[in-house]
A protein has these predicted regions:
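Acidic/polar, low-complexity intrinsically disordered N-terminal segments immediately downstream
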Residues: 1-47
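Intrinsic-disorder/low-complexity, polar/charged segments enriched in Ser/Thr/Lys/Arg/Asp/Glu/Gln
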Residues: 3-5, 50-54, 115
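Exposed beta-strand face motif in extracellular beta-rich ectodomains
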Residues: 4, 64-66, 87
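Beta-strand elements of well-folded, non-transmembrane domains
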Residues: 12-14, 72-74, 95-97
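Short coil-to-beta strand junction motifs in C2/discoidin
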Residues: 17-23, 81-89
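Mature extracytoplasmic domains of secretory-pathway proteins
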Residues: 30-82
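Short beta-strand scaffold segments in enzyme catalytic cores
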Residues: 91-93
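C-terminal partner/receptor-binding element of secreted or periplasmic proteins
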Residues: 96-121
Length: 121
């Protein structure tokens, strides 16, 4: 089975970075499906560059799984749902530098968002 470098990117405007804690996790698996590592980033670390947060596998791997957790830092400016539209976040998964998946997430300002164990080969 071929091995690849996987990258997980999250991109959004300044509102999501100011109002949410964004956590990315990228898990590595060998050809037999055994876990062999995890790398993480959040918007409180030096991984954040402007409007983008990213993390990549440190060495080639047969398979990768992604997890996203978006947790509110506090309550929205208004307690009215109609005044607090979802925040937009774009996730991209790259394999050897080429985009293999892209998702547009609508992040609830009151409850956040999560995406768990989506796998790529």
């Amino acid at each position: 089975m071929a091995e690849h470098i996987f990258t997980l990117e999250a991109e959004g405007d300044e509102h999501i970075w100011r109002q949410m804690n964004v956590h990315l996790h990228l898990y590595s698996y060998d050809a037999e499906g055994n876990a062999c590592g995890v790398v993480s980033a959040n918007n409180d670390t030096s991984h954040k560059s402007g409007k983008k947060l990213s993390v990549c596998t440190p060495k080639p791997t047969a398979e990768a799984a992604i997890c996203l957790y978006v947790v509110p830092k506090g309550l929205p400016e208004s307690d009215r749902v109609s005044d607090s539209p979802p925040l937009k976040l774009t996730l991209r998964v790259l394999r050897d530098g080429q985009v293999i998946d892209s998702m547009k997430r609508q992040v609830n300002q009151f409850g956040g968002d999560q995406l768990i164990n989506v796998r790529y080969k």
